[in-house]
Amino acid sequence: MKISKFTIMEKIITNHHRVIFILSVILFRIILESSYINAIPNSLLFTSYNLSPSFNNYLISWAIFFLLIPFISDWFTKASDYFFIIFLLVVITPMLIIYGYDAVLSNSTSNSIFSLVETVNSKSIIGIIISFLFIQLILRLKMPLFKNLPVFKHGFYIAITISSLFVVFLIFWYYISGVYFNLDLSKVYDLRVFNSNLSSKGFFAYTNGWTYNIFNMFLLSVALLKRKTILVILIICVQIYFFAGSAHKAVLFMPILILFLYFFSNRTPSLIIIPISLILICTMTMVLFTFFDQRFLLGIFLRRLFFIPADLTFAYFDFFSTNPHVYWSNSVLKSFISYPYDSLSVSFKIGSYIGEPKMYANSGFISSGYAHAGYLGILLYSFILGILVKLVDYMSKNSVPPWFAASIIITPFIFVLTSADLLVVGLTHGMFISLILIFLSRGVGLAQK
């Protein structure tokens, strides 16, 4: 009996899956490091770029990287598996690279490893490690409260109805409000404020985001689940329409993420595809930049996805290490605590601090947690986020396919990890809406789909 080369390769991958996964993760870091050295200097970060490697920092960064790898899974069995691999590869790895290659930013002139703990960059790395491991701990705790969650017999169809109503409303609202429709990615920043002033005032600031971030992507996931090809195409066209009206690039790329989750998870639960895909994206971006001087993908992927969030995290720690913390005086505690920075928001304050006074320098939950209450703020946000991630795992277990739950929650996950305060993601970016949709989708026999 003749065995095909594909079958042999499949057996090799299955038998050595964990090893191949770890090697692909390591290769991803090596390629991302190469891009930081060779490509990023030509696509400036918001703070100063200093390629001044520190031997001690570099060794520590690799040691931390290897210590965290065992905490991520190489198989996709629940939504949290995606959360942690994104956390490590997209958030932590770029920070470790900057930490190892920028001794000037680290304020480190000493050769002593112990002295590095006192630098701003080291405080940032400590904060992000604490958060990663604390969320891991939360997910390992038993929470009997989740076992009492009710199941709605027709909840899935209620979720579809609500989502459809919001989508139809926004289609008409964008047309009625008079937004300027634009498909040119290079013009989105010029039109974002203009379109927002027309269509996103008051409560619409929330509902519009919920619609294109969550409701329409939920409908896309349902269409994929039911294998309705025409409906999938229609929903993607609607999402392109929402991109044209919102002027947010992320809106355009959300369907790609969900299609990726659906097609690859249906073929195999292996998560090797994540580092391999990131390797291909980084390599393609660098090839286009090196040989064709194409900087568009360099700006979107390498710069915006990986290094700007990392760079801004260091900026947040640098500023709030020597300036007053906010203690939620700009939001839930504003009636009890005075805000220390007049009318300037935290994001604009950081923008001014790094020399970009007109920039909305928003960062992920670790930066915002530190801005509010230092390491205590990081622990509090990590605890809340850990509870929410565990809730997603529990609600989707034996109820909906893992890819389906991940598709609904993936956008809020990315926002909270890279570019927004946890409370903002919960409300504005629709994390709480995502949880409600997953909750309603339980109990209708979707797990076997």
Feature annotation, model-predicted:
Residues 1-215, 219-220, 273, 380-381, ...:
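Membrane-anchoring hydrophobic segments
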Residues 5-6, 116, 120, 128-133, ...:
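Hydrophobic alpha-helical segments of polytopic membrane proteins
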Residues 8, 13-17, 23-24, 34-55, ...:
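Small-residue-enriched transmembrane helix-hairpin modules in multi-pass membrane proteins
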Residues 66-74, 218-223, 239, 258-262, ...:
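Generic transmembrane alpha-helix motif of multi-pass integral membrane proteins
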Residues 79, 226-227, 267-268, 373, ...:
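Short coil/turn helix-boundary motifs
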Residues 84-87, 207-212, 228-235, 249-254, ...:
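Short hydrophobic alpha-helical membrane-embedded segments
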Residues 206-222, 261-267, 284-290, 326-334, ...:
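Juxtamembrane/interfacial segments around transmembrane helices
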Residues 238-252, 257-261, 366-394:
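Active-site beta-strand/loop microenvironment that shapes enzyme catalytic pockets
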